[in-house]
Curated annotation (Swiss-Prot):
Binding partners and assembly: Homodimer.
Record's catalysed reaction(s): N(6)-(dimethylallyl)adenosine 5'-phosphate + H2O = N(6)-dimethylallyladenine + D-ribose 5-phosphate; 9-ribosyl-trans-zeatin 5'-phosphate + H2O = trans-zeatin + D-ribose 5-phosphate; AMP + H2O = adenine + D-ribose 5-phosphate
A single MF term (Gene Ontology): cytokinin riboside 5'-monophosphate phosphoribohydrolase activity
Upper taxonomic lineage: Bacteria, Pseudomonadati, Pseudomonadota, Gammaproteobacteria, Pseudomonadales
PANTHER family in the cross-refs: LOG FAMILY PROTEIN YJL055W
Function: Catalyzes the hydrolytic removal of ribose 5'-monophosphate from nitrogen N6-modified adenosines, the final step of bioactive cytokinin synthesis. Exhibits phosphoribohydrolase activity against AMP in vitro.
InterPro entries attached to this UniProt entry: LOG, LOG_fam
Superkingdom of origin organism: Bacteria
Keyword presence, Hydrolase: yes
Pfam family, one: Lysine_decarbox
Disulfide feature: none
Keyword Hydrolase among UniProt keywords: yes
Family according to the record: Belongs to the LOG family.
Protein name: Cytokinin riboside 5'-monophosphate phosphoribohydrolase
Length: 195
């Protein structure tokens, strides 16, 4: 799969450890070095601002999508290649998904998880065939991955759908995995045969 743009979901907070910001810098820089456009939530704060600043500093193109309410709160990044202001969170997610060829989640909070799970669900439902992945940073997503495996074991998620979520220990490894990903064909829902 040829990637031209990658949407990054990440926190509006820098997190408790400097390793999170270091990972955001590495990802932003690597996206720019590969000539990939960064699409993200448009914020100037937390990991959002860090990944955008790193991509811009490395000569990359950065497109931010921000809801009007957050723009009015003055957290929108003013130095982006392009900042689009939309009506609300639903429009933001839809526009980011429209512009992106792939999705990566850095560490973040509820908004990051919600964005990741929404695009993952869209992929499961066949609304898109775009790869998504987690950048492994300091074991941040390990508890979530364990829970996701539990969902498969309990037959609430198909293994094929669980397998849609790639992971990488470095930006290079993750971007290579996303570029090599091919969608698997699987029934939408878990087998409903009684046990």
């Amino acid at each position: 799969m040829t990637l031209r743009s990658v949407c990054v979901f990440c926190g509006a907070s820098p997190g408790a450890s400097p390793v999170y910001q270091e990972a955001a810098v590495a990802l932003g820089r690597h996206l720019a070095e590969r000539g990939l456009t960064l699409v993200y939530g448009g914020g100037a704060v937390g990991l959002m601002g860090t990944v955008a600043d790193a991509a811009l500093a490395a000569g990359g193109e950065v497109i931010g999508i921000i809801p009007q309410s957050l723009q009015e709160a003055e957290i929108g990044h003013k130095g982006l290649t392009r900042l689009e202001v939309v009506d609300g969170m639903h429009a933001r997610k839809a526009r980011m998904a429209e512009l992106a060829d792939a999705f990566i989640a850095l560490p973040g909070g509820l908004g990051t998880l919600e964005e990741l799970f929404e695009v993952w669900t869209w992929g499961q439902l066949g609304y898109h065939a775009k790869p998504l992945g987690l950048l492994e940073v300091n074991g941040f997503y390990d508890p979530l991955l364990t829970f996701l495996d539990h969902l498969v074991d309990e037959r609430f998620v198909r293994a094929e759908h669980r397998g849609m979520l790639q992971r990488g220990a470095s930006p290079e490894a993750l971007l290579d995995a996303l570029a090599a990903w091919t969608p698997s064909v699987a029934p939408k829902w878990v087998d409903r045969t009684p046990q």
